């Protein structure tokens, strides 16, 4: 690289070096070579495209995905809202697939905090709620389930109503539990859900 800086293979070599440093989790060294490609070899289209894609991993290693999009904008590269949404959502799904609830909550919170109108807002709240419930953090879980119940006709609506009803009932909050169970009976097509909602309402009325 140093002996033949103008060789047309140098841009490819820099990309490969950047990729190697990324595999070693060395974001700073990777960035140095990737930026060199973009600054010194702007006409190497394929290598420029690869360098831009790999820079996403640089910022991911720094746990700063939003910084990646600021960087793109600073270089005059167009960023679609959907692309940014998908990139910030990907770590949430990866954490869920790995069964890592702590990381899932962290990534879902980051996603919600850094996307103005998140496309997967309901899913993020649902994943967080389930993780909190698994950890027996019921108040935190209820916050997210309740959020979902306030946005009807989503994929997790009946599940959120059911869990919110059970959590509030266990907390002796029979008034709110009754509301959740009543709505669940009205909207669910599942026999088990309807049976649970009727039973829940019966006991709520009993204790009120």
Residues of each region from the PLM?
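Acidic, polar-rich low-complexity tracts and alpha-helical solenoid repeat scaffolds
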Residues: 1-208
């Amino acid at each position: 690289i140093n002996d033949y800086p103008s060789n047309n293979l140098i841009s490819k070599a820099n990309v490969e070096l950047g990729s190697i440093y990324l595999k070693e989790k060395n974001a700073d060294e990777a960035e140095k070579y990737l930026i060199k490609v973009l600054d010194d070899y702007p006409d190497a289209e394929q290598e420029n495209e690869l360098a831009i894609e790999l820079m996403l991993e640089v910022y991911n290693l720094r746990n700063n995905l939003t910084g990646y999009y600021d960087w793109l904008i600073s270089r005059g590269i167009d960023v679609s809202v959907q692309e940014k949404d998908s990139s910030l959502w990907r770590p949430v799904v990866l954490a869920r697939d790995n069964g890592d609830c702590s990381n899932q909550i962290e990534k879902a919170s980051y996603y919600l905090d850094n996307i103005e109108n998140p496309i997967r807002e309901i899913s993020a709240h649902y994943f967080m709620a389930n993780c909190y419930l698994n950890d027996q953090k019921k108040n935190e879980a209820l916050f997210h389930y309740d959020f979902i119940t306030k946005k009807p006709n989503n994929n997790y609506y009946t599940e959120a109503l059911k869990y919110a009803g059970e959590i509030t009932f266990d907390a002796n909050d029979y008034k709110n539990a009754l509301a959740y169970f009543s709505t669940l009976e009205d909207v669910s097509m599942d026999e088990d859900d309807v049976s649970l909602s009727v039973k829940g309402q019966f006991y709520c009325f009993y204790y009120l």
